[in-house]
């Protein structure tokens, strides 16, 4: 397995698909990286030679990926929560931040349903 940006990229996949195993690289960015380095997108990762892998590593190093990207996203969310703005409050409460309805739905964000408490006398 080729190791790029601290991630083992699957050998059996095409280069453009294999690069998506790296957090922060999707299909469009993987396509642009392959075009910029001159690596064929249909070439399997196991067939890449060392010079092509080095070109890919250099090109990917220009982007924020993996741990740095995760850290940046979590710091942005933490900043919103510290500001106390609407989006920060929604993050703090574990509710959707982008205007979705919550009376029904929003189960992914809210978690499993809590059973209704019966009234005791």
From Swiss-Prot:
Gene3D superfamilies, per database record: 1.10.8.50, 30s ribosomal protein s13, domain 2
**Keyword tRNA-binding found:** yes
Q: Molecular function terms in GO for this entry?
A: rRNA binding; structural constituent of ribosome; tRNA binding
UniProt keywords, alphabetically = Ribonucleoprotein, Ribosomal protein, RNA-binding, rRNA-binding, tRNA-binding
**GO CC annotations?**
cytosol; small ribosomal subunit
Instruction: Give one GO biological process term.
Output: translation
Give the residue ranges for region: Disordered.
92-121
State whether keyword Ribonucleoprotein applies: yes
Q: Which residues cross the membrane?
A: none
Extent of the signal sequence: none
- Role according to the record: Located at the top of the head of the 30S subunit, it contacts several helices of the 16S rRNA. In the 70S ribosome it contacts the 23S rRNA (bridge B1a) and protein L5 of the 50S subunit (bridge B1b), connecting the 2 subunits; these bridges are implicated in subunit movement. Contacts the tRNAs in the A and P-sites.
Q: Which family does it belong to?
A: Belongs to the universal ribosomal protein uS13 family.
Q: Mind telling me which PANTHER family this protein's record contains?
A: 30S RIBOSOMAL PROTEIN S13/40S RIBOSOMAL PROTEIN S18 (PTHR10871), SMALL RIBOSOMAL SUBUNIT PROTEIN US13M (PTHR10871:SF1)
- Assembly: Part of the 30S ribosomal subunit. Forms a loose heterodimer with protein S19. Forms two bridges to the 50S subunit in the 70S ribosome.
Q: Could you tell me what this protein is called?
A: Small ribosomal subunit protein uS13
Q: Which organism is it from?
A: Herminiimonas arsenicoxydans
Q: What gene is behind this protein?
A: rpsM
